[in-house]
Amino acid sequence: MRVCVFTDNSYIFEGFCRLLSRFEGHTFDFFYSPWNAAFTPSVRFRPLRLKEQSTEFFDSYDLFLSLHSKQLFPAELVENHLCVNVHPGLNPHNRGWFPQVFSILNGLPCGVTIHKMDTELDHGPILWQEELELRAEDTSKDIYDRILAKELEMLEAHLPDLLAGNYTLTPMAGEGNINYKADFDRLCQIDRNECATYGQVIDRLRALTHAPYENAYFLDEDGKRVYVGITLRKET
């Protein structure tokens, strides 16, 4: 089987590559988004813009994998080829941007979903999924790191069956909810006059604390951003 893998996540790329020794007889080609400055082109890992590819390119692969790709897969691709997404959320809850951020805020379950893609965002029948515990001391970075580790664990466990076609497609349990980048951007600006409980403030800050990124901020008297984060430690 010839597999086309799209990822913009270095941790997932490196971890997935370590699994490949188990899959002799299959060919894996790796691509990332051209605007991703974190990567350098190499023989094994090349920039490629999906929407500019021809039908001949799509037809040359048996399976397309999206592993934290920043590109939307074209309708022509997902409607005519097997495309599978590894999504860092528990579909149908918090589809879209940064599922773990919104799980901290709205209390919906978080986890990992491997699903067949369709033309909607983070949508389609489910192959495998696992829920992860969201702890009171978790920041976005804490739970996200566990999600990434779980993704690699699930890929190792289920990739043989995926390549062999040994899986069952289960419809999503409803449409759930979806969050967009604009929703996240609105969360980042803190209004110091907004009324909230201590619990709501703590949850907002831990949802937006994700080193090395500076997300939460308020504006000072000069209109300059002052960035805010939170450190949490559970007693032993």
Identify the meaning behind each predicted range:
Residues 1-236:
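One-carbon transfer enzymes
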